[in-house]
Amino acid sequence: MSRRIIFIGAAGEMCRLAIERFAKAKGDWELVLCDIRPELLSNLVEKLPQGLATTQHLDLYDKQKLQAVVNGADLVVLGAGPYIRTSAPVIEACLEAKVPYLDFDDDVESTEHALSLHEKAKEAGIPIYVGCGASPGMANVLVVDAANELDTVENIDCCWMVGDERPGIGRAVLEHFLHITAGDCLTWENGKRVNHETFVETGTAPMGGGLGEILMYETAHPEPVTLPRKYPTAQRIRCLGGLHPAPFNGLGRGVGLAVHHGEMTVKEGVDFLEDLLNNKLGSAKGWKAAISGMIGQVKRKESSFSAMVEFLTKSAIGKTYPYKGGLLARVYGTKNGRPAGAIRRTVKSGEDSYLMRDMAAITGTACAAFMVLALDETGKRSGTFAPEDWAEPEAFYTALERVGTPRAEIVESVL
């Protein structure tokens, strides 16, 4: 009998990639692709094997319709963001229907809400799998892989870098970016949970994908919230992230601060970023914030004036940068009684990469691999789980291969 898998928010770029790549895994699946605009899914259905997928209109805030859709499913995958608004109603419906749930949530607040439902999920006899994307997601698995090389764990850096994807990034992604560039940042320092200001502390790491040693920013992400549950004796756990080229970070910080301080609304901030990504002029209010952010970045020596001028000049004539991105996990601790470290990172990025061609590719492919694992392990666990709680590294890497990823692209160790 076919196993019925529901995708909610299926028309989103990352979810589309997850569907395409999951379809490469062998299995008797029935895919139901739900979206508030199902007409956007027709070309996706045509790409899939005939009869594999059907489409359905769904407003996830229509509680009765949502419940009817998820009832009887073997797995529900939420791809609609921002998760701070979308995850709670879908998880509630899955608990009611007693069906497994999986998402690629990258917001702290909604991740913590899902974790608070651990006992309810156990009572319902279902798993709630959160953060099953790139970062969080594959990044957490890389941490476990690196940590397994050591005897003790003291410091963990989860690192992500996203390249130039102009034109065209979804509004939910842009809203998330503004959310992590200004405001509070829950993190783990001196062996306890503390609050920092996001996008202030910096660090560098030897990223793959052609990036090399590059500066990134501490970001408000779920990894420092979930990983201490597995590594409670660690002294420092942080998430470092950023965009390439570097001036994108100053621009985002400036607009994020303007939104955080009430000088722009969230909609105005997202509208401005969307205009820039699509080579439109953007608002004067947005440019004031963006320039302020980039100048501040130069003054702090986080980037150079020449890099800012080059970025603005290229942007003015519609030129973009070659895509460079990646994930990296760096763990310090001890081995055989001596200080030691271990690094795991993705290998390549850009147009000729399957896994790290862009943000949608890495997130969607990782999500597809987590889905394969979750379906392979149906009935094995109940409760709420972050990736480090259940996805064994080698099993995850094999799942990435099952959804089409060349083994040589998946992971490498760095001395």
Feature-to-residue mapping (PLM):
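C-terminal catalytic/substrate-binding lobe primarily of soluble NAD(P)-dependent oxidoreductases
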Residues: S2, E149-L415
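N-terminal Rossmann NAD(P)H-binding glycine-rich loop of SDR-like oxidoreductase domains
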Residues: F7-R21
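Helix N-cap at the beta1-alpha1 junction of Rossmann-like dinucleotide-binding domains, i.e.
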Residues: G12, R37-E39, V108
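Conserved glycine-rich Rossmann-like NAD(P)H-binding loop of the short-chain dehydrogenase/reductase
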Residues: G27-R37
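Rossmann-fold cofactor-recognition segment
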Residues: L48-D62
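Conserved Rossmann-fold cofactor-binding substructure of NAD(P)-dependent oxidoreductases
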Residues: L58-G72, P82
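ADP-ribose/adenylate-binding Rossmann-like module
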Residues: P82, A93-T111
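Rossmann-fold NAD(P)-binding glycine/threonine-rich loop
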Residues: D105-I126
